[in-house]
Amino acid sequence: MAGTISIRKSIRWIPGPACEPTRTMVLTSPQGRFVDVRVLKKGEGDGAVDGAGASDRSGHLPFARLDWAIAGTSTSTIVRTPDETIRRCRFEHWLDSRTATPDAMPPDEGDMFPLADGMTLEKGRMVNPDTGVDTDYEEVWRDESVERGTEQECVVLRYDGYEDEIGHDVDERRGMMVKLGGHAQGFIKSRGEMAVGRWKMADHEEESEAGNEAGNEAEDDKQRLRCVVRMGRVDWLPSEQVFARRFSIGEQLQVGPLLWVVVEAV
């Protein structure tokens, strides 16, 4: 399986109309590890309406603008019915910004249907965060091509905290970073705080959520990176390093106090 860069174009809570209140991107590695970041557009949500949704001068967005962040693994199976063949995807949440216990959440599954314009229609059922009620939904996704011009096509790093000598959690943080082509997304969370980031090479054209609102481009000039989204302690995430060189599986990378481990490299 190849890695995928998926951009959501719309979501529809049945029977309502389709809309897209977020800038949603999912980076999925060839082995199915993913980081899914959904940021409310400026003007969406209570925080943005009352002014709390604007970024500060450093380019950081407030967590009022975070709709959802997820990291985990995905698998797909083929389901055949008398009428059609369906690709059913299952998403295992290892990290989830909406809950401290993602393992206890109901299965996250969606059925995928190809559309004539090359996009994908996903159908499923999940809790509508606006109502708190399980609701049928439809999402439309567009996949971008994965550029091959970067140092390494895909690298995935994971941080899983550590325990003391008698098995007590000393650091409860968990994190995942996926770099795919010229894009990268990272998500790290503990019980008390979290950080979410999205980066891309400077010659890509997508607008920066932070740069457009803060009056600066929020660029990391040294690495020619553009930070599209930054929330919380993004210095915990290996954003510059994943673009700087090639990595091997099992390699360890120190980022501040955190020792990340490479779990996938292509």
What are the functions of these language-model segments?
Residues 1-69, 79-266:
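Lipid interaction determinants
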